[in-house]
UniProtKB/Swiss-Prot annotation:
UniProt protein name: Crossover junction endodeoxyribonuclease RuvC
Annotated EC: 3.1.21.10
Organism: Corynebacterium diphtheriae (strain ATCC 700971 / NCTC 13129 / Biotype gravis)
Entry-linked Pfam families: RuvC (PF02075)
Reaction it catalyzes: Endonucleolytic cleavage at a junction such as a reciprocal single-stranded crossover between two homologous DNA duplexes (Holliday junction)
Family: Belongs to the RuvC family.
Note on cofactor: Binds 2 Mg(2+) ion per subunit.
Residue numbers annotated as active site: 4, 65, 138
Length: 163
C-alpha cells in the first residue's frame, strides 16, 4: 500500500507485486478532509478512511512519503499529525511501514530525483499500463510510492539479511 500523506488530500493506493519489476494496480483514491474543520475531526476522518482501506485490501506493507520542511510550518505540522495517524493504523495491524523521500521515489520511478509532477504522472501511468493518468497528483504519488517500495523491497531484504 502506498500513501501520499496530506490532511486536505491524502493519496491511497494498493498494488500487487509480480515477477521482476511487474506491478499490478489494485486500487487508487484520495481521501479529502474539509480544510476548515477542526484538526481532531480531520484526523478522525483520515483514520477512518485508511483503516477502511487496510481492512478492505489487506496489504502486507505500507510505504509512506517522508515529510520534509516546505516552508509553511503549519502545513508541515498538520501533515506530520496525519502521518502519525497513518503509521498508527499500520502498526495496529502489525504492518511494516517504510518511509521514502520524494527524491527517492522520483529516482526509482523516473530515474531522475528531480522529476516534476507531470513526468512522474506520465511514468507511473506507463509503468502500470493505465488507460489514463491517475488524478489528482496525490493519487499518482501514492501509486509511485507503492511501486517504489515493490522495486526496493528485494534490496531491503538483502540489506537486512546481511546485518
Amino acid at each position: 500500500m502506498g500513501i501520499d500523506p496530506g490532511l486536505t488530500r491524502c493519496g491511497l493506493s494498493v498494488v500487487q507485486a509480480g515477477k521482476g519489476r511487474s506491478v499490478i494496480p489494485v486500487a487508487v483514491g484520495v481521501v479529502r478532509t474539509p480544510p476548515h474543520a477542526e484538526l481532531s475531526q480531520r484526523l478522525l476522518e483520515l483514520s477512518e478512511a485508511v483503516n477502511s482501506w487496510i481492512d478492505e485490501y489487506q496489504p502486507d506493507v505500507v510505504a509512506i512519503e517522508r515529510i520534509f520542511e516546505r516552508g509553511n510550518v503549519s502545513t508541515v505540522m498538520n501533515t506530520a499529525h496525519g502521518v502519525g495517524v497513518l503509521v498508527l493504523a499500520a502498526a495496529q495491524r502489525g504492518l511494516p511501514v517504510h518511509m521514502y523521500t520524494p527524491s527517492e521515489v522520483k529516482k526509482a520511478i523516473s530515474g531522475n530525483g528531480r522529476a516534476d509532477k507531470k513526468q512522474m504522472t506520465a511514468m507511473i501511468t506507463r509503468i502500470l499500463g493505465l488507460v489514463e493518468a491517475p488524478k489528482p497528483a496525490d493519487a499518482a504519488d501514492a501509486l509511485a510510492l507503492a511501486v517504489c517500495h515493490c522495486w526496493r523491497a528485494p534490496m531491503l531484504a538483502i540489506h537486512n539479511s546481511q546485518r
